[in-house]
Amino acid sequence: MRSLIISLNFNPGHVSHMLASYKQCEDLGYESVYYVNKKFVPFLPQKSNLSLFGGDNCPKADLAIFLFPSEKNLPLIWKLKRKGTKIVYIFHEPLAPLSVYKNAGFSTKYLARLWVIDHISALTVKWSDMVLIPSHKAVKYYEENSLYKNKNYYYLPLMYSDEREQRHKQLLKKNFSYIGTVAADHSFQEFLEFVEWAVENNRLKAYNFLIATKSEFVVPDSLRNHHRVFIHKGQPMTDEEINRYYASSFAIWNAYARTTQSGVLAKSFMFGTPAIVLRKNMNEFTHDGANVVVIDNNQDKEQIVNALKRIADNIDSFSSECRKEFEKSFYYKVYNNLFRTI
């Protein structure tokens, strides 16, 4: 049996998800093959089975797993189904009501783009044999959206392989970090303003601040070349770079204005790193005082400081609980039997 792990739009943040599906299919007896945009090649494990998307190339397979939306998915699904391939779509982000995105600060232009992406996703959903949805909130949005016609859907949390190795455990957890895309709903500006304030007022003196993103942004003058601030911006990161950033953090910014299911949260738990989250975004994976600390206002700097102190004072306990949640909810092997049956 052969499985294709498919991601046609390049995003290095997708590698962890792809790796988990690749390994899971191998565990279940498939010959796994990455079928991807060529830009992924340097970011994928060496000696992996690999086939590059392009032209009329359409490999034969028993199973094809599409991990992310793309207009390129649609003709490929059509070709694969003609060959008898079973299509599975891991639907990370069913569209919330547009008012949710507007309230989070997205522009009208971006809302129009979301509308287009959603209609492409709806066709991918319709043509798939099975749809996997990663959170209770995502299931709710899926069930409320009349565009999503496929009734053969299942709740299955985001899956990861365990990428934490001994070298990661040895890193000092010294950073409060923002990791991921700069986006309005991720409240990046609030994080940046907090870091400026903390540096200028010499708060949290024992700790440093990290921003790791492929996005571009203007670095405030007060943070340029500051010894307490490390910034990686404007270029993709390898999976190993991303992993080191998580492993060297004692807390992760997840106090987003809006989130359906955060891959940042899951990956921070992989490395035993707790997160700061907004109360309104608490979900089935987060437990205040155990693997996250809840705040009510991501602009309240003293509230953020108190949350970080709570984590720092109990880091061993928080880290242990994060690992437990990762192993229970996000480790792909937990779902091997379920995936086999559905």
Q: Model segments located where?
A:
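Nucleotide-activated donor-binding/catalytic signature segment of Leloir-type glycosyltransferases, i.e.
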Residues: 219-244, 289
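Conserved donor-binding/catalytic core segment of Leloir-type glycosyltransferases
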Residues: 167-186, 192-195, 209
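Acidic donor-binding loop of glycosyltransferase active sites
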Residues: 244-260, 273
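Short hydrophobic beta-strand element within catalytic cores of glycosyltransferases
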Residues: 274-279
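Donor nucleotide-sugar binding/catalytic pocket of nucleotide-sugar-dependent glycosyltransferases
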Residues: 126-165
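Active-site proximal beta-strand in glycosyltransferases
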Residues: 63-65, 80-104
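Membrane-proximal helix-turn-helix segments that form the acceptor-binding/catalytic region
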Residues: 110-131
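A charged, aromatic-enriched C-terminal amphipathic alpha-helix characteristic of glycosyltransferases
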Residues: 299-302, 312-342
